Regions:
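Viral virion structural and adsorption modules
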Residues: 1-21, 27-34, 38-99
Length: 99
């Protein structure tokens, strides 16, 4: 039996009062192929506040989302999350060159 060990990376941020959690699992010296994102909170649109709840899977090879699921998903906020994903991925891959 072969046991595979994975490294788990996690980060949190806030985008327009929406809580964003990023996570990835990967093997040593290999970049993660998928970054998972969970975003939830009240959308900043005045009196009729709606609660956004989104689960996203970002494919690092195609630089695109494999899936976007949830309720009241605001694409403007998703666009603001993309730079967070890019920074998260960059910081993970930087660790390979720092050893």
């Amino acid at each position: 039996m072969e046991i595979n060990y994975f490294i788990s990376a996690k980060a949190t941020a806030t985008v327009q009062n929406i809580n964003v959690s990023l996570s990835a699992e990967y093997q040593k010296d290999q970049a993660p192929e998928v970054i998972s994102v969970v975003a939830n909170g009240y959308l900043p649109n005045g009196e009729n506040q709606k609660y956004m709840n989104a689960a996203l899977k970002y494919n690092t090879k195609s630089s695109d989302f494999d899936s976007i699921n949830g309720a009241n998903v605001d694409l403007g906020i998703i666009q603001e999350i993309v730079p967070l994903i890019t920074e998260f991925y960059r910081k993970i891959t930087e660790t390979f060159t720092n050893y």
